[in-house]
Amino acid sequence: MPSLPNESDHQATCSLSLHSDLPYQPSSSIKRKVRKKKKNGAITANVVGTKYEIVRLVTEEMMFTKARDDDETANLIWNDCAVQHEKIAELRNYQRINHFPGMGEICRKDCLARNMTKMIKCQPHEYNFIPRTWIFPAEYTQFQTYIKELKKKRRQKTFIIKPANGAMGHGISLTRNGEKLQAQDHLIVQEYLEKPFLLESYKFDLRIYILVTSCDPLRIFLYNDGLVRMGTEKYHPPSESNLSQLYMHLTNYSVNKHNENFERDETENRGSKRSIKWFTEFLRANDYDISKFWNDISDLVVKTLIVAEPHVLHAYRMCRPGQHPTSESVCFEVLGFDIILDRKLKPWLLEINRAPSFGTDQKIDHDVKKGVLLNALKLLNIRASDKKKNLAKQKAEAQKRLYGQGSMKRLSPASSDWEKQRHTLERRKEELKERLAQVRKQISREEYENRHLGNYRRIYPPEDKLLLEKYEGLLATAFQTFLAGRAASLQREMNNPLKRMKEEDILDLLEQCELDDEKLSGKPTRPKEPRTLSSMPESTQTLKKLKNYSSHSSSNSTGSSSDTEEEEDEKEGKEKKVSYDLEEHKYKSLERSSRIHWKPPLKAARPFSNSSSPSSAASMRRSVSCPRSITALNTQSPTTDQRPFSSRISSTITRPLSGNRTNSLNRSSSSNRVPQSGTSGSVYPSISESRLDHLTKEQEEELTKQTLYALRDMRIRIPGKGVEEITHSHIDEIMDNWTYHKSKVASYWLIKLDSVKQRKVLDIVRTNIRSVLQRIWKVSDVECLHIYRSFNRVFNRLLWNHGQGLWSCFSNSGTSWETIFCKSTEVVTPQQFQCCQRLVQLCKDCLLAVYKYATDSRVAGMSPDWDDSRYLFPVVPQFTMKSSSSGVNCSSSRLPRSSILFNPRHNHY
């Protein structure tokens, strides 16, 4: 049952060994330490707004200095209750306060019910974890209609009635006669879960602690322990005789602590309050699926906070207008989720507390809540230098504004076309650089979080790519649902394709902007020096970078990852920051920097020889574009475990490269290989390094060749059409009458489809290609493949400039996307390049198929709203692959699914 913020909401135990030298004491007997005089550069904490002594103890253990009660400039401000928006607006960038504006949209019972109802209408299968709820008096009529339907079916249900903004179990009652409820009061009526999961015949709920460190971008952490709060009377299904026995039906600590049967125990596995850590072990001992249990809990939490995100982000932006995108969030929040389990162990959300109780009446409260607070403050990364850096940054920005630096000139009405193009290009470059800074800041933040998670784990953004895509889809739906008709700029920002791009993708776009800038300025085009595939040439500049990287990594390979040394450095004031400067020691960053600050290519130097470095002979190098299984070779002959290839596969590839591309493209993976220690895991001294590289290269080429043939066999068709009515004839018909269709396709792609819809069209191709790569390369995560990274760069180029990248492929030249490989240090082989060419052709076919379906549907009157880009695709085109032997077609599913299947092109696949 729900429990109220600000009250002793006592919950279960997890014995964290944070500091065993601080024995548990009841909050009434804890003595506050006398703080020494404030030192310069110390981290200050203003805790006058809390009544919980455990908060003060944790700040002291973190070595924070207690600020004066009236000090509004402290690094940390803690309040038990929600704070006014004006106070958040007045905070400086180095400060942190423990509440977000707008979080009441899920923490008030009536707001939670209202927002969940809206999301259930949009995503009923995803939001099925909250009991059916009505808000009185607004939904009184709907409730009475529901009661009448139950009577017709001769069914009777129990309902729980709560005050809309109540707490601590006050005003809660149960009823089985819904028709007797009155509409005057502001109440929340909810279906009662009659068959809960029981512990020793007692009903219970879980208090899950959640930390939100940022809303822009959203970052959520789940604490791996919490409290199990049990009723104090054995549970029986609700009936007219026991509806008033609240000690049986309610699990609130504030209610049950008054019962004489309430058991206070100093251990975590007995009493009326226990730890979730103990509960997890209990489930494991009884053969329950622990992994599924925690995944369900995490899923519930993330989906609930996705409902809050549009409200919170909008309110936060209103409080902090003009804040730099790379600035740290001044708000964080520790939330208490109250969750109940049914008999099938499915979690159901009861309520969310934005000010969960941090009272410590029992040892279990002290252990769990101290860990929640201590680990949360460590994750916030509050540093003494933040204040000084913030003041310096403010001064620099003030000087910029004073001298007019950093701001772009405005165009006059009389500006020429050249000036307009130049202005658009400069704006694009500024946008890309800003997003690049955000991505690098996010990478730095993630690296810090991974080192200081403690007993937390990050549940958003998740590591699983498919799960992240699902959550991003729900997030987009939430923004469309809750911010419809307002916050247009915020919605445009959420739909910006740059938000989903990685660092290397943004660097590619920046490089393209540099090339466009050169063309616009009339600079001579750079010569494209041919490179020989067999020799794998590398520039002397690249060799120098690689040597510096190797020596640096070897000298820092010991001790750099030691947590104790990091903490010592922090104590000495040497705050370790992850730098992503373009001149960083990492070779990958150096490689990317050469793409932005381009220089004419140097003469190719000889590649490394085994004799040039004594240590390199014993080391094993693995190509970053090849699955790990390829290099796990044994002493057997390489021909024994190679799969046979048909004559078609062994035949030469005859499609020529288009445009100015030549067969000089080589593999970038050779320059990215980093020597590994000779003593690492699976090194086979019987295979020389050159032999291993040769085998790896051969297998990569074979797998790339298989990928190319698989892509050539892919055909797109419109669902609902027979296999004979393959879409290819429709596409040919459009291309034959291109003069007629050109303007219509352009209007459809560039105007009617927004950026989200354009990405959905190309995602049809992307999803099927992922399945092909997973099948051929035998890897589940294709992100590690060099060829897939090349595909991603092509996809991003096709979506560039609001879809102009793909549209330019319909022109006579149609090779503008090839420029992303021209001067990139990541070199592509001819076969990989032909795969990219086939990918572009599939994207063009997919667009024409979607356009054809939209046109036919509109003419037939099947989908009158198809042209409105607000609507989702009613039907998604499918890809088929023909087997050369059987000729049977197998179509993929419509959106990303792990079960997409293709008929194998050859039996040995």
UniProtKB/Swiss-Prot annotation:
Interacts with both alpha- and beta-tubulin (via C-terminal tubulin tails). Residues 548-562, 604-625, 658-673 have a biased composition (Low complexity). Residues 518-531, 571-580 have a biased composition (Basic and acidic residues). The keyword Cell membrane does not apply. GO terms for cellular component: cilium; cytoplasm; dendrite; microtubule; perikaryon. The record marks R108, R354 as: Binds negatively charged residues of beta-tubulin C-terminal tails. Polyglutamylase which modifies tubulin, generating polyglutamate side chains of variable lengths on the gamma-carboxyl group of specific glutamate residues within the C-terminal tail of tubulin. Mediates both ATP-dependent initiation and elongation steps of the polyglutamylation reaction. Preferentially modifies the beta-tubulin tail over an alpha-tail. Competes with monoglycylase TTLL3 for modification site on beta-tubulin substrate, thereby creating an anticorrelation between glycylation and glutamylation reactions. Residues 532-542, 626-657, 674-688 have a biased composition (Polar residues). It comes from the Eukaryota. Belongs to the tubulin--tyrosine ligase family. Keywords: ATP-binding, Cell projection, Cilium, Cytoplasm, Cytoskeleton, Developmental protein, Differentiation, Ligase, Magnesium, Metal-binding, Microtubule, Neurogenesis, Nucleotide-binding. Its EC number is 6.3.2.-. Mg(2+) 2 binds at E351, N353. It comes from Xenopus tropicalis (Western clawed frog). It is found in: Cell projection, Cilium; Cytoplasm, Cytoskeleton, Cilium basal body; Cell projection, Dendrite; Perikaryon. The enzyme uses its core to engage the disordered anionic tails of alpha- and beta-tubulin and the flexible c-MTBD (cationic microtubule binding domain) region to bind the microtubule and position itself for beta-tail modification. The c-MTBD region is positively charged and becomes ordered when bound to microtubules: it interacts with a negatively charged patch on alpha-tubulin. The presence of positive charges in the c-MTBD region is essential for proper binding. This is Tubulin polyglutamylase TTLL7. Residues 517-580, 603-688 are annotated as: Disordered. Coiled coil: none annotated. Residues 390-452 are annotated as: c-MTBD region. GO terms for biological process: cell differentiation; nervous system development; protein polyglutamylation. InterPro entries: TTL/TTLL_fam (IPR004344). GO terms for molecular function: ATP binding; metal ion binding; protein-glutamic acid ligase activity, elongating; protein-glutamic acid ligase activity, initiating; tubulin-glutamic acid ligase activity.
